[in-house]
């Protein structure tokens, strides 16, 4: 009984304080205001300020009462507390930016500071003040000014300036200006930019800051040191809209009077800088012409010398404001991911890199390195030393089958470290009372833990280990933000318990003993009014306080920033008022809780950070109030005190890996070859190995007794020495236990993103060219197919084995996951709309329990929302095209064409629709073999009788025309053809003439502009059984094509010999072909074995398209103009691949050089500024590279062990300086697959200086493709090319900068044969025997408005040619009337009788009157015709009474003189002719015909039109165009006498009299000795 009484008494004693606590109600004071969203606190005071509308209000009693600040005039845009003088200083900025207000006494008085007037209008960014941490009188005022100019948004096309200028945006010019003051703002001086601003720079940036950024700064600098970054930016009007930036980073110590530039950054573009406590960090942009290029990080501790930090990945989208330093001096970089402008979450953090304590080697958070990409957040409470909480939210969004019913779900994982990131654990939920409310077993921490995302970088209010957060509990496989709840921790985040079932805003006070929380949604407790909850026992129990109004909480905060006070501000708003938002500001006061009792010593306990372990060589503890103590600490304005005790012995936790080492999977520091190359350890020794300690003590660690660290011998074999370019090459190796079976880059300049699929069906993504590779989380599904959108370069689609489709539109940074229609996957590719990114067609199988089931058939499903929803579009469709989006002038933009194969039939039909087959369905062809689209054409293969094919072409989707193939004796049935490509108005097609497997070949054809009329370009062009053809157009250059022909095609067709291939090249789009000229000597300086002058017997031959392992490995690159690699040999024909060498050309194929004796793989970088070769089919540890366009080659060892390189690649535009090698190495127990990223960026001294208008500069000159280049396609062209090998080009569309020097006169090379004509051995176009020219009147049917047509001359001008004048081989005949248009034709070419008769009669009357007047006044009056013979010039006997008489007499005398001379001339001529005839008859006795002394090209061209007269069936046979000179010498005895040289030449010459060649150049160059015609391959 006594015991029970004692228990009851004890219970009562404990209960009474709790009852008192429950009875306690905080003091709540409400203030109603308009448009007030931010409240600021002065440190260690009761004063608060806020901006209300455009004025400033202040409270001196922790927010209970407010008053307007009277000393501030005008409209205020924003206010802020001075971060270095938080106790008493605040700044208010005026709307116009010309002045601001400062208080130095917590708002009691305000001083107006007037800024210098620049004479320019201030921008909305206005001005703001930066203060100094040590001197209150030091100010930097940063202002932005913009000129009052209209923004021109016109997007007119380039006018086509000769030098390829890019248009500069005409936008408002804005300028940053910085003003400095050292007298508290009484006077300012401008720190002027040291960059000269030109008229094309719309933006000028000046960013200055004090070198000291904290009161405990470790940087070696004076108090007056100021760092300034000046930038001028201008924009290039190209497809990337890239800004061009020039910059200077300077230091001033005399307030801008003198500026000292940092030498290390003189030739670099400084993107930004950040001054920290111990470091200055500078970011330099890798490419000044691409603001999305990767950046380098430079670190300095003394503001004089900078070192480049090692980055494990490319830094492209850093958040410069989010570069900071932790307590250990480590630099933390937050990397944002680039997003489109339409996305709301643009700029969110995607990766976090943390340096070592020296700031020179960065690495990602370890457990995120091999995870998928996503949003990453790092929370480091400064008052909890060593604590880091990281959250990863992968960018894979999942939607349900219908897309929206269940909302957006995502995966996430959160981990915590209390030892500076050395070890990480899950956020454990230890809450037995609420265990049943979770969907997983909270005792299984690895699979059931707290996941959160919304921590800020630093905790705002210090507490003794008491933290709150919102999140969910699970295994990370499902994360729905709508299911968030609120949790609390009392041990610094290691363990958590549930506080509320809903998410809340929260704030803590009294070092965590008072907590206030308010739900985001007022309806959480089923009543419409808002409420807040508070706890006085560190979250153990909660009490509700009901508010009378429904508000949307904006912020809840402790009025003392150091967390020592017990007063709070709750700021919320309501939208109930029509005139704007109304704010409700609640002041909440807990200072009298527990009957105003203050805690005593026995109310406190020790709380140890990191569970009492050593952190940074120190054990930390905090004295905090016991949870159930009935008191408040009440040490207002005192900072939370942290007690530390140095640890006696140092452990491995106090060390980090030395620069040359990295941690392996077990946590051991092991040597890294790439880091060894970057360091200087091997520069200090001549030995093969050097001892290096793998561990170094963390900078700032306070442990007392260092650990003994043994050195490790590092191999220096193959490590480049300091001072060599090879020293600057950076290689990153990745090893895998699987093979990469597929890879493809996204074709953008934003970054070097690529997607890879391994042999297990797993997807991997890299955004830095393979340097870092991360796995894509497909939720357990095997990836069975990958499709890239050919029209939108950032989009790709991954097909999962369980019916999911994963789509990305940002190069793999994020994925949207949707379910495919409930149909069997057939493996058919997607078909995309060329103008709508989210519209595509998917093909699935219906009734396909078995793929062989007779009911199984394909169905085309349409999506317009990127795959969220699909609708069934057409049954039995196996291939569709969005035809309306492909044509330049479509008949209907919504037209879709589909190939349909019915279940019961083997035939296929082509149908079209303009409403996705809802109501409109039109059958275009009843029976087809297939169809495809290329270059604005759709070509349909239709079966014909006798197993032949016919092709039909359309350019609008409605009208189809049969493609007319040329008649040729070697073409039998049209059984197979391959569309090669379509560009600039013509289709190239290969028509098979021999289809015996292994012996395939055919003819190369080219169409006219509408794709309907084809002519033969070359015979016996090689193809393989799969239809691939040895045909390649050289990228970036007009009209250059390489093909391989079967030289022994007749015997191959007869099955007597195997194929013998020869390589041919054309420089005028197939009109003329030649064999490749071989180099005179090989790569070793030796002559080649074959030395025949005939190219038919000795030329260069290259392996072509049909033998490639990867069809992307082309000879040429669109960005490296004129350059080509190829594997081949010099000889009579092509040898087997293994017996060949590697050849290279820089002039588009005119001349070649052997660069390697064996087959090599090649790749272009930096627009050809860096060339890389690697041996093919043999193990190697080295690559060869050239920076002088192949003139010299250097070898570089990229790995320690030899590997078999499977492929070498880079970005599709070949503009990067980094290459990716895929290799396979033999290891113990098998082989391992490896990738090597080789970065050449640092071997160049600088970036080339480029004028964005395309003008020549010191580093770029215009030059022809080769010294022998003359006219090509009717014009002479020069290309802008780099001249200095020591600089790199970067992201400049260099291939687009060219200029035409002039248009040339037309020559034979500007023409090709017309339809039904063929090119004879002599170079002329002749009509095919037995055929007539194409019916020219057909054009009248295609164009009903025409009234006339012209007959073909046998030639047609090459579409690419711009020649003017000269030879007119395509000159049309006389016009003929179109059928049915005879009347219009006559009207066009006849003249009306009435007007003509009037004019004719009028002229006759005038002539008659004039003649009569002259006769009457000049002849009859002077004696008539009888005296006509007596008149002499100057005769005075004529009658002249006035001026009229004198004029008439002069006319008569002049006429007499003219007629008398004509008579004399006729008489003299008659005599000479008789004399000449006599001599000619004498010579006919000894000669058989006339001869010419010298017939030069000019004379020939003068007669060209005459030679072409007649239009006979041989197309005005010009005899031949063989390789002969244009001047013809004759024998001495044939030289005529002087008289003979005047022999009249009036007859038209016969074909035997025409010269044998037309020169290759134009008329202006005919006298040059090297002006010769191309050789003919059949001579």
Swiss-Prot record:
Any one biological process term the GO annotation gives: protein targeting to vacuole
UniProt repeat feature BNR, residue ranges: 58-68, 101-111, 181-189, 416-425, 487-497, 533-543, 764-774, 861-871, 1143-1152, 1185-1194
Chain segments annotated as transmembrane: 1394-1414
Secretion signal, residue range per the UniProt entry: 1-21
GO annotations of cellular component type: cytosol; Golgi apparatus; membrane
Chief place of localization: Golgi
Places the protein is found: Golgi apparatus, trans-Golgi network membrane; Prevacuolar compartment membrane
Record's keyword terms, sorted: Glycoprotein, Golgi apparatus, Membrane, Protein transport, Receptor, Repeat, Signal, Transmembrane, Transmembrane helix, Transport
UniProt xrefs under Gene3D superfamilies: 2.10.70.80, 2.120.10.10, 3.30.60.270, YVTN repeat-like/Quinoprotein amine dehydrogenase
Topological domain spans for side Cytoplasmic: 1415-1579
UniProt membrane topology term: Single-pass type I membrane protein
Source organism, top-level taxon: Eukaryota
Family: Belongs to the VPS10-related sortilin family.
Protein's name according to its UniProt entry: Vacuolar protein sorting/targeting protein PEP1
